[in-house]
Every structure is written in structure tokens, then in C-alpha cells.
Amino acid sequence: MSHIRFFPRHRLALACMLASVSSFSFAQNQCAVADLQQSRDLAAAVSGAEYDCYHAWFSAPSATLNDIYSEASLSRIQVALDQEIARYRGEAEQARVLENLGEFVRAAYYVRYNAGTGTPEFSEALSQRFAQSTNLFLNNPHALDQGREQVGAMKSLTLMVDNVKQLPLTMDSMMAALMHFNRDTAKDTQWVDGLNNLFRSMAGHAANDAFYRYMANNTHHIDTLARFASDNAWALDTDANFIVFNALRETGRLLASPDQETKRKALAVMQQVMQRYPLGSEHDKLWLAAVEMMSYYAPEGLNGLNLEQAKQDLAARVMPNRFECQGPAIIRSEDLTDAQAAKACEVLAAKEADFHQVANTGNQPVADDLNDRVEVAVFASNDSYVDYSSFLFGNTTDNGGQYLEGTPSRADNTARFVAYRYANGEDLSILNLEHEYTHYLDARFNQYGSFSDNLAHGHIVWWLEGFAEYMHYKQGYKAAIDLIPSGKLSLSTVFDTTYSHDSNRIYRWGYLAVRFMLENHPQDVESLLALSRSGQFAQWAQQVTVLGQQYDAEFERWLDTLEVVVEPEQPGTDPEEPSEPTDPEVQVTELAANQSLQLSGEAYSEKLFYVDVPANTVRFNVSIEGAGDADLYMSYNKVAHYYDFEMSQYADGSNEEIQFAPEQNGYVKAGRYYISLTGRDSYDSVNLVAALEVEAQTPPTQVQDDLAPVVLESGEAKVLTVHQQRYAAVYVPEGVKEVRVWMSSQSNANDPYGAGNVDLYASRKHWPTAEQHEYASNYAGSNEYLAIPVTEAGYVHFSLQAPQQGDDVEMLVYFF
């Protein structure tokens, strides 16, 4: 709701005011990797860094593991961290130092994780010392103080536990911190998000033998988590609801433990949740979470439930609207009006026409593709998407939407892409609408077979994701072009991309490679698409390898020529209508994130800015500080003024801050935020800062796997991306004597980022781990084989684990 406060002046008076002089002041930080490598006191340099240094730390080259990120260097950082914790008294400047040191450690572990299998791990002793640093911090009486800097320190030092993978050492202190959650502390969702790092770490320790052993000896923690969720059920009606949801969800994930008592207690909690929050009740997302965990790890607990009927009932309630486009799309939605759905149809029709022209398809589908219709399922918000989509459609939800092709050769198949709206006004505001629709079109007209068929020989992810990005952005993809100065990738490297690589390489560099090929070598693209349309993916991979080597030098030169070209509006998407006419002389200026802009102004003057918040932003706040009396007003996706705004914390003086809490998925809503700095009186030397931290650009943790088990079928190959661990299972019917499993790497062994290594473990009675299993194949690389004798019907369970660098692998099962 808008908070509107009228001042005794007219809008026209503001427009006619003479603009006062502004001056820019940017922080100069010696935090680049090269500067840190030359620093005589690394801990001091890290301690004094600003927020915008983090990107350089997380994106540092693997060579830094020999200097600033070496074991010896981190040992000295750990000593400095303990010293700072010992003297911590809750002061903001002290907290900033702690956060900097914590982020530096996390960056080191992230760089190590991405360095490949040839680089030694940090020692267990070092990781344990960092875990003890977290304990030391949480035992400090000021550890849970509130305030921007204080919360930043708490979040960094608790999330560090997942990086060093030492939750068994910190579980007690993190559980004790959780008990400080109450109605007062719940008001600060950033603080609550710091407590939530316990559950991030629990998810990150799935299939971790040390964690499962710890929980087997400390099952009282399951009782504590159940009481926590029950006692704090009131929080389900607040913005802090995610902490209760995640407490129960991660309790459910303990069903994967091989320890029977752990599993028994976790199952009892899930059954209690289902009874307390039945489907159709106000907080039935907890029922859904319990069902999801049980269906993955304890399906026997769901006997007697008609889940298919439950899905139909839920879909009818959550997505009641249906609109058929004249083309292939059928739009199901939670809150789109018919007029909005019709506009979406226009957008998709325009995109389809553009697609056929760019890809030169002749409107001819590939053979055996029966997906002549596609269902577009649009949730009203990210919260709804996270709550319901996985249960209804089986997709993961830690993303901006997903295309689910199914098996295109089956007549009863339903092609579907699932999306959500990032705003609920008159505009469509459907995230990644064109990107996901391009996936449907590309699969139907350019790619023979299923998604697994497409990935079977590698060298195609650059096209699948890069082409979808190109069709959405064309020449206007600023985020991709902005990557170039930070370090070029060769075309061959981009062509070798798999889904186990980072999002920049998959999407943005994929876009650059596709754009280069379409603009400079369209005939080669035609030749490649002729191969993919006929299912010749091995030949595709061979040809792409040749083209990469052939055009590497040209691609490098071409990158230097790029600049952003703004595309005209697509047909059917009207420009946003302003709430009031905008005066011609009013200018809205882009505000650079994480940089201080110093402003001065007269009474009643107004300065307008905007800042773009990208996807995967974990922290965003806008603040002013200075002399005089200036006020801060903001709006989302529309120009903000003092007389028309959505958010403000205006007060006497020029010291104000607006914080934006993350949504249920842990990220701040992406989009454009507008800022009005208005003089209630004159003001001078006021610093305006939009501080944000983006996980996609500076990944704070290793990429998370989809931990939902993949159900295998005999004779059908499945391709899985494994970062750290994945689960799979196959149901073996009566009469089968032996199950044989082949796992093969889909990556290029010559990839400069290093070949992966995924090990395969199997058990018949429980989910296996690296220590507790019945069968194992753990050779070097990701090519593994198991022959498993069976004597009765039931599931065989598999765990795929990457001790260092992950990989894309294909699993194939046969019964004998």
C-alpha cells in the first residue's frame, strides 16, 4: 500500500525549480585481486573493503589458490577472524569487518570448488577451524544484534558453515540461535534470513555421511525443530513464514538418512504436518512440502492418498483461468484476466513469427514431434510458484520458470512451461515468457527427440540457452555484453558448456556465441540445425568442435565491437502508462549500484533515479545520509514522486533507509526500482547509495543440486547434472534377477575447466551414501558401472556424488 504524504507545494512548482548542483563521489577500493596479491597485510585489506569488492573475490581466477586463497593465507585470515570476533561489541564498523572476512573465506571456498579436480581441497582441519569461528561468533552476546551491518556479519558467518561443510560442529549453536526467533525479531526478515542459514546448510549437507552420523546421535534436534515449527505457527501469517516452512522441509529431507531412527522421527513429523495443515487449508503449502519429501524419500508413507485427485483439486483452485490462443498456446493462470491472457497470446504469436524467420524453419516441425499445443502455466507470484508448482508439475522452483517438454513422440504428452508474474498490475509482468516459449519452439522445430536425446553428446547447451536468450534480447542484452571486460571466453570454451557450469557461462556467454554465429556465420547455423532436426547429435558435437577452433580468433575480435542496441517494443506489448503525465524537463537518471552519489539541493527540489535489480539479488537497500532535510521515496516499475510512491521511511533530517526483504525463494524481487530524492528543506552533501548483492554474479555458495530423486525406467537413458550430489531410483518388478546400470560422462574431457568426477552408489533398502551403501562404482572420472542382484520387487536407490567437480552424466538401466 502506498503511504502518501502531501507537502504544501504544487507539482508544477517543483518542475519549475532551478536544479541545484550535484557532485558525484565514488568509493575507491583497493580490493581487486591484483591489489590483494600485492598487499602486505591481506587481513587488513580485506577488513577495510566495501560491498562492491565481493564480486572480484568470488570471480577470482583459480591461480589465486596459490596466493591469497592458499591454505596458509586462509589460516592467517582465520586467526584474524577469531581476533575480530573476540573484540566484537556489536558496533557497525566491527560488524563490517566480520562480514568482509566471512565473505572472503566463502569466496575462497567457492573459487576452490570451481577450480576442478586437479586442485587439492582445503584441509579438514582448516574447515573445522572456520566452523569453530562460527561457534565463537554465535556465543558472542552481540552475535544476534539487529542492524544492517550487524545482520550482514551474522548472515555471512552462518552461511560460511555450508561452504566449509562442517554443520555437525555448529549445529548446536545454530539451533540455539534459532530459539531467539520471536514476534519482535521476526519483523526484521533480513535477520530471520540469517537464522535460515541453518536450513540452507542442512540442505547443503544432504548425503553427507558425517552429518547423517551426527543426526543419528542427536535425533533430539528433530524434536526441537518440530516444536519450533509448532510454537511459531503464528509466523505463517507474516513475511517471516519461510523460516517455519524450511524448518519442516529440511526435517523432511532427513528421510534420506540411512539411519532408521532418524528416518522414523522425521516421518512422524511429516505425518503430523499433513494432519495439521490438510490440502485446502490456509497454510496447505506445508502439506505439500511434507508430501514432496515423503514421495521422494519415503513413498510408503503415502499409501492410501489419492495424489492424482489432490493435484486436480489443487490445480482447479490455484489456476482457475484458462484461455486458448489462436496459435499453439493454452494459457492457464492464477490471476490473469482474459484481456491480459489475450495480450500474452499476441506476445507469443509475435515471438513465434520472429522465431521462424530467424531459425528459417519453414514452419516444419521435426519428425515424430506431436507437441502441437503447449500449456503456459502462469502463477500470480514467485511465492505461489514455489508453493505449488513442484507438486502440480514436477519442476524445480529455484529458477525463473521452466519448460517441461515431456516425451514429444507420445500422443498423450503435454508440453508445458511454467512461469510466474513478478508484478500484479495491468501489465503482463510474466518472467521469462519469451525465453521459455522459445524453448518450446526450438524443441519442436529444431531439436529431434527428447531433451535427454539433445544432451546425449554434449556441445549443445550453448545453443539451447543462448538461443532462447537471443530471441528474447536480440542486440539488447546488456548483462551479457557487460561480462566481456571481466575476461573473455573462447568460442570453443563456450561451445563446451554444460549445465554444470555457472549461469553466466550458460546463459550470457551462450547468448554471445549464438549471436556471433547467427550474425557472422548463418550458413554454419543452417548446417548445424539440419543435424539437430534429424537427430544427428553426435555429428552436431563434432561439427561444433571444428567450428569453435575455426572461429576462436574471429570471435575474440568480434567481442570488442559489441554495444547494446535497444530493441523496439514487441507487438502486443504496450509501453507502461505513467500514473500521471511526466513533465518534458523531468529526467530519470540511472543510479549505479553500490556506489555513493553525493547530492545537494534546495527546498522543494526533486531528483529522480532508477536502479535495476537483477535476478538472484539477495540483499537490496537504498539509503541517504547527510546534512539538511531530504526525503527518500521509491516505487517498483514506475517513476516515484513525493506525491506518488509505494515505499518510504521519510523522517526529519537526511538519514533514511529503505530495505527490501527477500521473497520466499531467498531473493529480492527483480525489476526496476525508481527513486525520488525530494527536499523538504534544503540539503547538502547527501550521499545516496543503492546497495545490492547479487548471488548470480558473485555466487556465495556452490550451485545447489535438485535433490528430488529422478525415477529411472529400464532401457530409457536419463541425463542428470550433478554439482555435488543427486538421487535416482528404479522400480524393479517381480521376476528380475539383476539390475545393470551404466553411467557415462557427457562432458568434453578437454574442457579447460576440467573434467568432472561423479561416483555412483546403490542400495536396495535405503538411500546410499559414500560410506553406507551396498554397491559402489567410484573410478576416476564419471564413467561407472554396477551389476546389482535382486531377489524381490521394489526400488533400487542410487546416489550420485561429486567429491570435487561435478559433471553432466547419462544413466541407463537394464533388467536381466
Curated annotation (Swiss-Prot):
Record field: catalytic activity: Digestion of native collagen in the triple helical region at Xaa-|-Gly bonds. With synthetic peptides, a preference is shown for Gly at P3 and P1', Pro and Ala at P2 and P2', and hydroxyproline, Ala or Arg at P3'
Cofactor(s) needed for function: Zn(2+)
The keyword Lyase appears for this protein: no
Active site: E436
Cofactor note: Binds 1 zinc ion.
Gene Ontology BP, a term: collagen catabolic process
Positions bound to Zn(2+): H435, H439
Listed InterPro entries: Peptidase_C_arc/bac (IPR007280), Peptidase_M9_N_dom (IPR013661), Peptidase_M9A/M9B (IPR002169)
Residues of the signal peptide: 1-27
EC class (word): hydrolase
Subcellular location: Secreted
Gene Ontology molecular function terms on file: metalloendopeptidase activity; zinc ion binding
One family name in Pfam for this protein: Peptidase_M9_N
Superkingdom per UniProt: Bacteria
Listed EC numbers: 3.4.24.3
Keyword set, alphabetical order: Collagen degradation, Hydrolase, Metal-binding, Metalloprotease, Protease, Secreted, Signal, Zinc, Zymogen
Main location class: secreted
CC terms in the record's Gene Ontology section: extracellular region
Family named by the database record: Belongs to the peptidase M9A family.
PANTHER family attached to this UniProt entry: COLLAGENASE, MICROBIAL COLLAGENASE
Function: Possesses gelatinolytic activity. Can cause weak haemolysis on blood agar.
Protein known as: Microbial collagenase
UniProt organism field: Vibrio parahaemolyticus serotype O3:K6 (strain RIMD 2210633)
Gene expressing this chain: prt
